[in-house]
């Protein structure tokens, strides 16, 4: 298992709320320390848009093959590890292209087109259960269940087992915690074993009887004569499930938070013009996706970032800060769904490792927000809501555990 870089020692936020809305910290780092060395973690930290983009795309100087990482996902147990042939986050081109191609079979544009009606049906069902005039917990009612149900459905597993998937994902994506890491690792190993034992028979069955789902697509996937074994498919779906669920759930919950607290007029504007929803989703990804970061290892000595970097140095790029760079985005600390270049955000990365699941996350968010906007004309915050008490650590930063709101059709 790789050494996990303790990024909390770099940020040193005093409250969960401060980490959830890290704008002051991002502004300070962009203005005062755009490329800076952090002695405690022995890392170089990069914040400016062009520098972050350079590190993510220039694999000849900044490699994904590394001994340290900021990502604490999954476990190093036999059942919970990522198969070597799809370790796309830990490889550079040309190896990376082959590994990514194997995985990309599950995320083709054709697949997305086929999935759209299914996602629409699930979103409509969840929103159909909400009553206007009453208090709705948007996390429990939509942001949390939608991605889980969608992923379970797209993978072709029985709908009755969806809640099991939620439990496993929550555990496998627990963040790094230096004080409790031994306990966290044990929980992850148990979850990985339970998941593996549950899914393996389903994969075996789908090899015999393929269907229109992700598991069957992975079983058919072939690049240069290489295919997945049943074992590899099980472990691969664990990665897909976790990444697909966490990202979308986070995006949906934070979008509703933003509509309630960042700019209350945006909801009404979207309600009156649903064509603006895709733009709003992009701005939420730029403005309200908290602290996203990735790490790379310096491949050879260079001064491309204006400092002397040595081979083997660890570099952490902060995409969230890059999304707030005023040299790229005008008035960056303001929510603006009409921003002409908001799709240039780096939330899903850049270069060879651009997030494979980005189109699915965008599609789910667009469908869910549109369906909600069609049903409810107005939303308002619940005065008793305390943000600090409703946040928890996750692999994607501070995650909302609850977000009550009042919605009305009038």
UniProtKB/Swiss-Prot annotation:
Subcellular location: Cytoplasm
Source taxon at top rank: Bacteria
Record annotation: effect of changing residue 397 to P: Loss of 15-beta hydroxylation activity (for progesterone)
GO MF annotations, alphabetized: heme binding; iron ion binding; monooxygenase activity; oxidoreductase activity, acting on paired donors, with incorporation or reduction of molecular oxygen
Keyword Phosphoprotein set for record: no
Catalyzed reactions: reduced 2[4Fe-4S]-[ferredoxin] + progesterone + O2 + 2 H(+) = 15beta-hydroxyprogesterone + oxidized 2[4Fe-4S]-[ferredoxin] + H2O
Residues noted as binding heme in the record, renumbered to the chain: 355
Cofactor: heme
InterPro entries: Cyt_P450, Cyt_P450_B, Cyt_P450_CS, Cyt_P450_sf
Major subcellular location class: cytoplasm
This protein's UniProt keywords: Cytoplasm, Heme, Iron, Metal-binding, Monooxygenase, Oxidoreductase
Any single GO CC term annotated in Swiss-Prot or TrEMBL for this entry: cytoplasm
Entry EC no(s): 1.14.99.-, 1.14.15.8
Family under the similarity heading: Belongs to the cytochrome P450 family.
Job of this protein: Has the capacity to hydroxylate certain steroids in the 15-beta position. Also hydroxylates progesterone in the 11-alpha and 9-beta position.
Protein name: Cytochrome P450(MEG)
Organism of derivation: Priestia megaterium (Bacillus megaterium)
Lineage of origin: Bacteria, Bacillati, Bacillota, Bacilli, Bacillales
